[in-house]
């Protein structure tokens, strides 16, 4: 590996380099890359990246205990969209579902804390609407003037982000081989 890298003017850092078997898997740029017994190599969001994202969401909700629901939606939507778009290139649907559930639990605690004297049915009716056939959508209805309709702000779900696949590269193709210059 060092000879291959040195020919291209690159060096390996001994303290940062770790050689591991692909069956054990490794984390790289927030993804866990691992070969499974069925022979497939899958990339998933790593447990650490999922944990840190959930913690970021929890802290954002906790630090805005008195904020309106519309403010919460406006704060969280860019975070959810950005994280989801980064991790959409992999086997992420189960991870997205787990994180959606963690976000739901945090928002439910936020709503219960905000309205401690109200029943759980009242809280559900106020904050969790049924939109486009989907139940339990965290949403806020913004009241507008009489000449405009009220606006519904819905919290985005990671599960709604479509999973994409990268274009596969032929196994024998090598970017350093002049024969494949047209391929790359």
Predicted feature descriptions by range:
Residues 1-184:
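Non-catalytic terminal/accessory segments
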């Amino acid at each position: 590996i060092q000879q291959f890298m040195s020919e291209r003017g690159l060096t390996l850092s001994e303290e940062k380099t770790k050689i591991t078997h692909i069956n054990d898997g490794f984390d790289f740029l927030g993804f866990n890359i691992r070969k499974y017994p069925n022979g497939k190599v899958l990339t998933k969001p790593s447990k650490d990246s999922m944990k840190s994202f959930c913690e970021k969401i929890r802290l954002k909700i906790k630090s805005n205990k008195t904020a309106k629901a519309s403010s919460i939606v406006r704060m969280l939507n860019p975070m959810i969209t950005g994280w989801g778009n980064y991790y959409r290139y992999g086997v992420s649907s189960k991870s997205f579902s787990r994180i959606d559930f963690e976000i739901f639990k945090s928002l439910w605690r936020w709503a219960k804390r905000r309205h401690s004297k109200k029943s759980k049915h009242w809280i559900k009716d106020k904050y969790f609407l049924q939109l486009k056939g989907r139940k339990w959508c965290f949403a806020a209805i913004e009241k507008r003037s009489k000449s405009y309709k009220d606006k519904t702000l819905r919290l985005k779900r990671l599960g709604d982000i479509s999973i994409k696949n990268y274009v596969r590269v032929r196994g024998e193709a090598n970017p350093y081989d002049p024969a494949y210059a047209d391929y790359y």
